[in-house]
């Protein structure tokens, strides 16, 4: 079983838009499907740790910045 965690969707969206990235652009940069990113931003699904790592790398942030409960 792969570990999954809650993503702070609002924070993910804010960081993405601050970097002027569309869902598709972040998807291309990270290798994560844009519809998956959309679901994460809207709180419709948890993410695997590997997905959070890919998104964090693409956004040049620490993975913990994208997780729920981290301020």
Please tell me what each predicted stretch does.
Residues 1-18:
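A short, Lys/Arg-rich alpha-helix, primarily the initiator
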Residues 12, 23, 34, 49-52:
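Helix-turn-helix DNA-binding elements, focusing on the entry/boundary residues of the two helices
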Residues 16, 27, 56:
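The alpha-helix within a helix-turn-helix
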Residues 17, 31, 42-44, 53, ...:
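Residue-level detection of the helix-turn-helix DNA-binding "recognition helix"
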Residues 20-39:
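Short alpha-helical DNA-recognition segment
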Residues 50-65:
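DNA major-groove recognition helix of helix-turn-helix/homeodomain DNA-binding modules
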Residues 65-71:
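Short amphipathic recognition helices of helix-turn-helix/homeodomain-type DNA-binding modules
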């Amino acid at each position: 079983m792969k570990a999954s965690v809650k993503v702070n969707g609002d924070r993910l969206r804010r960081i993405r838009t601050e970097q002027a990235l569309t869902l598709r652009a972040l998807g291309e940069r990270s290798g994560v499907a844009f519809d998956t990113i959309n679901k994460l931003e809207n709180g419709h699904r948890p993410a695997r740790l590997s997905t959070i790592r890919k998104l964090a790398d693409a956004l040049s942030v620490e993975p913990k910045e994208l997780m729920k409960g981290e301020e």
